[in-house]
């Protein structure tokens, strides 16, 4: 790798935070909060709540949840109340992916500036950043919910670069989603590490790896 790099900018969800483990932990919290509605053994309800997290699927998932619980004559909170509570419960139960904390600590000790650039609702993303335990490690954080643009708009990448005090050539962006993370970094002129299990670089990323731990060998 080009050792002129001075900063590493991370995506959050699916890059540092383990979505699956976080949803599982959040569902257990919902079971504790609403023991009459949710049960840890009810896998269908858990999957419907996961679908419900994505607002584009929320209405259909809510109806499906109502149908699923109907035989037990149970009444869900209103769609808006449940969407808000489930979203914040998920955010407050963020679980890091393997090697995430170790890698960020490694980069910090090596003197790299560390940035975070994430799309999403401001309140939820900030709650997630704090709950995952990495907040003190970042030199600069950009949440799209606080801005008039989001990934893959090059403008939000430039905002991250400016906050870190580096140029595009001096940064590496790390993410798991082609359309937002990798394409956006490319448009902004930033080298990228695509986290994927694929062996073929179909995204046109600068580097490929299965997890963020690869950075300890790249940098």
Predicted regions and their residues:
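Short catalytic-loop micro-motif centered on adjacent basic/acidic residues
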Residues: 17, 115-116
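A generic secondary-structure micro-motif detector
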Residues: 52, 93, 115, 146-147
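A short, structure-level motif marking secondary-structure boundaries and short turns
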Residues: 46-50, 87-90, 110-111, 141-143, ...
